[in-house]
Structures are given as C-alpha cells and as structure tokens.
C-alpha cells in the first residue's frame, strides 16, 4: 500500500448530518466534488436510508437484459440449467451477500429464472412439470440443484453474523459500538433507522436462533 495516493479530482465527498452545512467548504478544502445518494458501488446500490422496491429495479433489469441476449429456445434444459447456476445466480451473488433482498425482488428474480428454464426465450407459456421450489432442491432430495436465492441470501448473511460474533476487527467493533453496546447479541433487536446491512444481520440472527438452542453449562457467561 506504500506510495498510493488519493486522486481527489476523481473523488467525491459525501456529508451527513450537521456536516452538510459546511459541505462546500470541505469539498473546496479537499479539492473534490460533492456526491449525492443513491450511488452504485460494484453493482451494489448505496443510500443513506433503506432502499425502496423501485430502487431495486435495476437488479431485475440487469437480469432481463442478460436473458434477452441468449437464445434460450436453442438450448436444452441441461444447458439452461448450467446458465442459471453459473451466470444468472452469480450476477446477484455479490449483492445478496450484503443485503437481505426484499421478498418482492426475490420472487421476481425467481420468476425470471423459472421462465428461462421452462420456456427459454419464448413468450408463449409452457406447462411446468413441477414447482420451482422443487427444482431448487439439492439433487439428493429430488431437485436439480438450482440455487435457492432466499436460502443463499440467508447463508451469506449468516457468514457476516458469524464473523461479527467470533472476530475482533475494525468493522466488527464499529457495529458493536453502534448497535450492540453492553448487550449480548441475542438481546439486540432491529430498530427503524438501522442500516440495511444491519437489518439483514438481525433478520438472519432471528431465523438462526429460532432453530437453535442454548447450553448454560457452568453459567459463568449467562446474563439474566
């Protein structure tokens, strides 16, 4: 990292709260422009508030654009299956590793994947031999191994939750100071105004804890 310098001419400054009053002064001081939300970073929409369904629209549009460039009707079901797992799922992989996608967005993405699998690029509806959630089951459970986006979303957020609980880094300490404080993570609840990332972690925690149990052991670390 030695020798790297910030190019302020290619940078933008984002101000929050009281700092917005002096935004122009800060921008002049650093010699860069002022940025405004929302922005897109590595394909991920970033905003100072929770994103609306309309702002998730670009995710659906990217998937549709990719599908429109394929000749699905010329592919076998096996060929479509490979494209769904290797391309379509990976297009949203980075995003679902950071945010809990809204149900409406997940259903729409599944609709596009299902339609491509059964119909190719044909607009004419074709009879589906089984439900999409059956197709998404592992092969040893009677499915075709298509990645279930909701399950994958939860698993990827679960990795961040595990790192939050087991590691001691900069981002972990920042989140703990802001949201956890002196409480145990099991006592922390989501509140309106919390970041989208934290909301996803809390939803994942709630899901995991509903399937888990606690062992008191000697009770030395148990809080009442």
Question: At which residue positions do the language-model features occur?
Answer:
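A helix-boundary/hinge signal
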Residues: 1-224
